[in-house]
Amino acid sequence: MFRLNSLSALAELAVGSRWYHGGSQPIQIRRRLMMVAFLGASAVTASTGLLWKRAHAESPPCVDNLKSDIGDKGKNKDEGDVCNHEKKTADLAPHPEEKKKKRSGFRDRKVMEYENRIRAYSTPDKIFRYFATLKVISEPGEAEVFMTPEDFVRSITPNEKQPEHLGLDQYIIKRFDGKKISQEREKFADEGSIFYTLGECGLISFSDYIFLTTVLSTPQRNFEIAFKMFDLNGDGEVDMEEFEQVQSIIRSQTSMGMRHRDRPTTGNTLKSGLCSALTTYFFGADLKGKLTIKNFLEFQRKLQHDVLKLEFERHDPVDGRITERQFGGMLLAYSGVQSKKLTAMQRQLKKHFKEGKGLTFQEVENFFTFLKNINDVDTALSFYHMAGASLDKVTMQQVARTVAKVELSDHVCDVVFALFDCDGNGELSNKEFVSIMKQRLMRGLEKPKDMGFTRLMQAMWKCAQETAWDFALPKQ
């Protein structure tokens, strides 16, 4: 009897021991899983604000409602601004050739903020549908949406407001008339412009829009490497099929290409190959020609020149010159600098050039040619910095001559230093200058077209998958 009681007591003791030691591990596992769940919930909560901003860029079908609501609120303020502005201009009595300064009211600022969010976070399909202004109806009755070259520049330039009564899926309707279209060809693009090669009137289709943004957002070196990879016989030329492969690979690496999804409902599908006008331009009428990297890079250079020319003309130059503040605005357009600092930099520029002589297009183009070599410029400026030399205006002009083979005028250097000489000692803040100029060179097209929420969730999911077994297995 005593033996049976002892055995039962030992058995119960063993069961209790197993329950105690076995139950402590699940408790620890549950604590770890609860900690992971808490961190995940915190990350989702922190991302809610980002999603809210994203929703503003995606949800409104057009800006008509926004314009009407904001117009009522800002009507009185706008009228006051206009009245005050008219009084000031009447008192100052400016020169007849001078343009009146156009002040943006509360309503315009809110609309431009909304349009900037569209440029930054929307899909290529929505960007194209919002900033395109023409819908051409063909003789069979089929309709296709087109951009003008000015629309294209506006779609990639921050703070450029879309014309009134034109917005998402709101267009000027034109019926196709071959004779009239041919007569109006020079209305949208000059004969020497690269846009003239795009077909009727120099208009830009959705496929052309994706192709042009790809060309603008891809460095020259990337195209050189891609051409060499598909040049199997080493003659430096590619045929049409090989070029389509080059284009597809390059496009898949850009932010526009990664965000694009074909949308048959809107008609914005990425057609295989290029438009007929571009294929003829690159490969001849029979499409059996060869395209060299030299000819393609010349096409890229002309495109950059024409886009820069359109940007210059948008500032309404007087006697072929734009003001120093307008040039500074071109440099800072894609900087991403906070509004307060941006305002301070513009005020500093206005202080230095109250009665400036302005800048010609040749001076502006020389500086942007200098920017095309910004990586080499960064290296050269770093060498000067390590050698203890000051980065003054003479140094910048020397770097431009050595690296980019262009001459920067003294006046251009004065404007650049007025913007980036923070402490006023006559020396350039090269780190900030180089970082902002790299963004300006790519026109903001290299930035991801999202708020980063998707990438955050993908990283969290990958981390959870890799660490799940570590939480589940007991510690040794």
From Swiss-Prot:
Changing residue 383 to A: Abolished interaction with MICU2. Phosphorylation at Ser-122 by AKT1 impairs its maturation and stability. Asymmetric dimethylation at Arg-455 by PRMT1 decreases the calcium sensitivity of MICU1 by promoting interaction with UCP2. It is found in: Mitochondrion intermembrane space; Mitochondrion inner membrane. SUPFAM superfamilies: EF-hand. GO terms for biological process: calcium import into the mitochondrion; calcium ion import; cellular response to calcium ion; cellular response to calcium ion starvation; defense response; mitochondrial calcium ion homeostasis; mitochondrial calcium ion transmembrane transport; positive regulation of cristae formation. The modification Phosphoserine is found at residue 122. The keyword Protein biosynthesis does not apply. Changing residue 253 to A: Does not affect interaction with MICU2 in presence of calcium; decreased interaction with MICU2 in absence of calcium. Ca(2+) 1 binds at residues 231, 233, 235, 237, 242. PROSITE patterns: EF_HAND_1, EF_HAND_2. Ca(2+) 2 binds at residues 421, 423, 425, 427, 432. The modification Asymmetric dimethylarginine is found at residue 455. Belongs to the MICU1 family. MICU1 subfamily. Heterodimer; disulfide-linked; heterodimerizes with MICU2 or MICU3. Homodimer; disulfide-linked. Component of the uniplex complex, composed of MCU, EMRE/SMDT1, MICU1 and MICU2 (or MICU3) in a 4:4:1:1 stoichiometry. The composition of calcium sensors within the uniplex complex can differ depending on tissues: a MICU1 homodimer can be present instead of the MICU1-MICU2 heterodimer in skeletal-muscle and kidney. MICU1 is recruited to the uniplex complex by EMRE/SMDT1, and it associates with MCU at low calcium levels, occluding the pore of the MCU channel. Associates with the MICOS complex. The EF-hand domains have high affinity for calcium and act as sensors of calcium levels. It is linked to Myopathy with extrapyramidal signs: An autosomal recessive disorder characterized by early-onset proximal muscle weakness with a static course and moderately to grossly elevated serum creatine kinase levels accompanied by learning difficulties. Most patients develop subtle extrapyramidal motor signs that progress to a debilitating disorder of involuntary movement with variable features, including chorea, tremor, dystonic posturing and orofacial dyskinesia. Additional variable features include ataxia, microcephaly, ophthalmoplegia, ptosis, optic atrophy and axonal peripheral neuropathy. This is Calcium uptake protein 1, mitochondrial. It comes from Homo sapiens. The gene is MICU1.
